[in-house]
Amino acid sequence: VMDNEGVKLAVGASGGRRITNCVTQVINNVLDFSMSPQDAIDFPRSDCSGSYVNLDSRLDPIVVQGLKDKGHLIKLIDAVFDPTGMSGFASPIAITRNKNRLNAGVDTFHSAYAEGY
């Protein structure tokens, strides 16, 4: 994502068909809600790329019930570290640039970390 000063945000993910949902949510969280990259990644997610709508179990139960009431098939996914790397969501990374400062975020539910110098 670019702004008048150049690169503002870079986002990527591993996770096959789940990548598009994940990257879109991270971009929205950073740009629309002014979240840091880490907060944007840590925020409860959803994924509708399969037969079920995978929802982060940390989502408000009212939201979950509202989707069920509309006929969506819901699968709640617990947000816990999975050493196998298998979960119901893609595994994102993101970097923002503000002038000469870089901030990064990684998926803490997989074995990943951000490092810089």
What are these regions (language model features)?
Residues 35-36, 52, 57, 62-117:
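Terminal-appendage/accessory-domain detector
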Residues 1-77:
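Proteins synthesized as precursors that undergo proteolytic processing into mature forms
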